[in-house]
Amino acid sequence: MKFYLLLTAALLLTAVIIEAAPTDHQDEARDLMREERDDKSNCPISHPNYCSFTPVCCKHECLSNNKCSSSEFIPGQ
């Protein structure tokens, strides 16, 4: 009987560990986000465009003079 209890506990623990580990799909999605953002800024995903002239993280693309094209920005790092 102890054998079956230990076996059950081991299977449950294995299931929990497997469930908690990130999947390959999650790793691929994370890598794609990094590839899309090739700048070295620490801008969040909500404001992904780093405009270096004013150092801000802009929600929309930067203008040709590297300034934010909208008023939706946060301080860059």
Curated annotation (Swiss-Prot):
Q: Which residues form the propeptide?
A: 21-36
Record-annotated disulphide pairs = 43-58, 51-62, 57-68
User: Which Gene Ontology terms of cellular component type are present?
Assistant: extracellular region
What does UniProt give as the signal peptide span? 1-20
The yes or no answer to whether the keyword Oxidoreductase is present is no
Q: Which GO terms describe its molecular function?
A: ion channel inhibitor activity; toxin activity
Major localisation = secreted
Parts forming coiled coils: none
What is the tissue localization of expression for this protein?
Expressed by the venom duct.
Pfam (any one): Conotoxin
Q: Where are the transmembrane segments?
A: none
Query: Do the record's keywords include Membrane?
Result: no
Alphabetically list the UniProt keywords. Disulfide bond, Knottin, Neurotoxin, Secreted, Signal, Toxin
Compartment(s): Secreted
User: What's written under domain?
Assistant: The presence of a 'disulfide through disulfide knot' structurally defines this protein as a knottin.
The name under which this protein is listed is Conotoxin Cl6.12
Q: Which organism is it from?
A: Californiconus californicus (California cone)
